[in-house]
Amino acid sequence: IEQSFNVPIFQIPEGYESSFDYLKHLTECALLNRYDNNVPSIATERLSYELDVVKEKGCADFFLHYFEFVSWAKENGILVSPGRASSAGWLINWLLGITEPNPIDYHLLSERFYNKDSARIPDIDIEVENGAQKRLIEHLEDRFGKDNVSRIISFGYYGAETSIKNASRALGLPIEDMVKLTKHIPEKILVSEDGLNQLPLKVTIKNCLKYDVDFKQFYNRCRGQKKQTIDVASELEGKTGVIGLHRSAILITDDTSKYSFPKMKIYDESLTDRLTCVASQYDRHNSEIYGAVLIDVVEDPDLSQIKQCIALIKEHHGLNIDISKIPLDDIETLNMFRNGEIEGIPQFDSQEMKTWLTALKPDCFEDITALYALSRPGMTDLVSEFIRRKHNSNTAYEDEVTRAILSDTYGMIIYQEQIMSILQDIARFSPEETDHVRRLFGKKAKGELAEQHLKFIDRGIEQGYARVIIENIWEAMELKGTKVFCRAYAVSRCLT
């Protein structure tokens, strides 16, 4: 049964029965072309799986719209990034030219992006050079009509500090007292559930009063207007304070759309002349609930710099550079990273990264990708272990399956996709089950993870593994599961 989304119908060429039929034709032809008519079975099976998902979810039109959109951008000289987030893991995206890395080559997984259990329409972000978003919106208006293209409204909500400032103004609290109140709001709130691990909580006034000892004591010392200000602020907190535009989401509809979206005119604060534009009154969350097609266009200044470099090379050296064809094993480039010569390189231009690179001495693209992933918030404490393992050839693996999955990160679990692959290859979890477990690790859902733990042990033993090995593997996943990063995101960013 096809899931119905609010997707405008894609106008397919004559000779095809449906948008799915056309998508199937495009991707199968592209697969033959990409592999020069020598397609490996893993690619054939991967495409078959993804097409089954598309057919069941009823979203062929969605991918065709993105195919047309990205193709038009590239044909009109707009620099588009290799990909963003998990969309690089979808083989269909690569075959249609929406993303650039071959997901099979980089061990990326389809189900990390989209699978049969996904509740909503896929999410693809397109990164482009500065100034290109307006051109792309105009292209969409040409295709669908101005009445069917709009921006998405966004709501800013009062946080703890803003609530206190607004309550202070309303109650006439002196500025110096207001400043004192805001200074007592902690930067973070950590709560321990088991007496060992501290988990961060959102910094709200209510959480401060409940969990932060210093703020609670300060509140109890307050009297009169100060205490009233905190009380009012706690009620004001979380209320809508600012209405603006979502920076990337563009809503498209047509006469075939099942739902209409209420719209309004709003100032686009990103434009110097403050022009008004049409925006849906549903925010992103509610638009997605109704199955809206949102095309995300993010302007990236790094792409503008890259395009300028390409133009300068052509001007001064007469060379036409295609950055998608630059070899990733170029010795001179790798030596620059090894020596910490990374000034001006997106994602890597920092003193901390320079120190790590000179210690790591990367000799392949995978090393650079892994270090980028480990540089993300919450993972930097693993960098030293990764560097040590890189230079120690005695890494031990539980078995050959985990060796195949973890060898390019020297036995460390760094990526979400590695956990998902372990679940599939060792315990025969389905693609949908692996994505579910991945989400549970991210949410630290102990109760549900305990159920999955038992399932992993039982299925692993059924596959012939000793219980001690299965337990060790689960323990390693549980230890790193809350910190791991999306590999598709890391690969895409490092290719930019």
Give the positions of each predicted feature.
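Alpha-helical scaffold/interaction cores of sigma-54-like transcription cofactors
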Residues: 1-496
